[in-house]
Every structure is written in structure tokens, then in C-alpha cells.
């Protein structure tokens, strides 16, 4: 489902832990990392799509998380011309996204990237809140900056109330399955 401007409706998901770190996932078989995201199906609300994508991409269910915030507006990014599929109709030139900030209420062990026969990710780790803004692929950076700026007021109090960590370096976890 592509809108009249050529953008595909999509949801983005930022999952934070009780220390205010965010889940950073490695795309399957690649060296690129990002937040979980995915398209909204016809007849599906953004929230319904978010829960579906949450399970498909990281194996978490509604009971495992709580919604802390959503972006006020849809945020858009354009795909680089080399990634646009010009032979499909209608042509999709980018994504328009509604973002959700979730707090993980269950254990790290409940994260399972093997719920699909074609997994999106093959590993993940907890990183500092602002880390993804500098590390995501360049054409998504502006959207990530805007998302994190909007969610910062919700996550920063979590970081301030969190006990100090024994291991400050991010732990890298392989897929479960």
C-alpha cells in the first residue's frame, strides 16, 4: 500500500530497557544495524502493525512490553535512487513512519529473532539512547534524530533512576532459535 506521494506506511519500534538503553538489531546477513520496523497492511492500524512486527522481527508479544510513547506525526524518509524499485507500480520512493517507544517488561531471554522463516535480524544488543542516530544508514539519520529527540523526555528519567551497570559496554547477542 503506497500513498499518492509514493511513500509506504510503516511503523518503527524503539524498545528500551529499564536502564534507558535501546535495542539495536543487526540486519540478517549484513553489517547494518537498525530499529525494528515494518509495513502497515491494508485495514491494519499502526498499533496493530507494531504488535505484529514486534512478534515477527523480535519474538516479543503485547505482554512483554508497554507503550511509553508514539510520535506525534508521521515521519518520512526517501530511499536512495539505487534502492527504488522502478519496475513496480506504484513506485515506492520511501517510507512514512509512525514510531512507538516500548519498554521491555519481560527478560532479555524472551527476545527471539527466529519466529519467521525469513528473519529480519540475526543479532542484537543494548546501546546508549543516542547511539543509533550516529550509526544508522545515512538516509534514515534525520528520521532517527527526530524520533529520538521526541522520545528523549520519556527515556531520560529511566536512565537517571537506573542503578549503575557493572558492564558498561554493550553486550552483543546472537539470535535465539
UniProtKB/Swiss-Prot annotation:
It comes from the Bacteria. A motif (Nudix box) lies at residues 38-59. The keyword Magnesium does not apply. One of its GO terms (cellular component) is cytoplasm. InterPro entries: Nudix_hydrolase, NUDIX_hydrolase-like_dom_sf, NUDIX_hydrolase_CS, NUDIX_hydrolase_dom, RppH. Its EC number is 3.6.1.-. Belongs to the Nudix hydrolase family. RppH subfamily. GO terms for biological process: mRNA catabolic process. GO terms for molecular function: mRNA 5'-diphosphatase activity. The keyword Hydrolase applies. Transmembrane segments: none annotated. This is RNA pyrophosphohydrolase. Pfam families: NUDIX. Residues 6-149 form the Nudix hydrolase domain. Accelerates the degradation of transcripts by removing pyrophosphate from the 5'-end of triphosphorylated RNA, leading to a more labile monophosphorylated state that can stimulate subsequent ribonuclease cleavage. Its cofactor is a divalent metal cation. It is an enzyme of class 3 (hydrolase). Keywords: Hydrolase.
Amino acid at each position: 500500500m503506497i500513498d499518492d506521494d509514493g511513500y509506504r506506511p510503516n511503523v518503527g519500534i524503539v524498545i528500551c530497557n529499564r536502564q534507558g538503553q535501546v535495542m539495536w538489531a543487526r540486519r540478517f546477513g549484513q553489517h547494518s544495524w537498525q530499529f525494528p520496523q515494518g509495513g502497515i497492511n491494508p485495514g491494519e492500524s499502526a498499533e496493530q502493525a507494531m504488535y505484529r512486527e514486534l512478534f515477527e522481527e523480535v519474538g516479543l508479544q503485547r505482554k512483554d512490553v508497554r507503550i511509553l510513547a508514539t510520535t506525534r506525526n508521521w515521519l518520512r524518509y526517501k530511499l536512495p535512487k539505487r534502492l527504488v524499485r522502478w519496475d513496480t507500480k506504484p513506485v515506492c520512493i520511501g517510507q512514512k513512519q509512525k514510531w512507538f517507544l516500548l519498554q521491555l517488561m519481560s527478560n532479555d531471554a524472551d527476545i527471539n529473532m527466529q519466529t519467521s522463516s525469513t528473519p529480519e535480524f540475526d543479532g542484537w544488543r543494548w546501546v546508549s539512547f543516542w547511539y543509533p542516530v550516529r550509526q544508522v544508514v545515512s538516509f534514515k539519520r534525520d528520521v532517527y534524530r527526530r524520533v529520538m529527540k521526541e522520545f528523549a523526555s520519556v527515556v531520560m528519567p529511566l536512565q537517571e533512576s537506573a542503578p549503575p551497570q557493572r558492564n558498561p559496554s554493550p553486550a552483543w547477542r546472537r539470535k535465539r532459535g
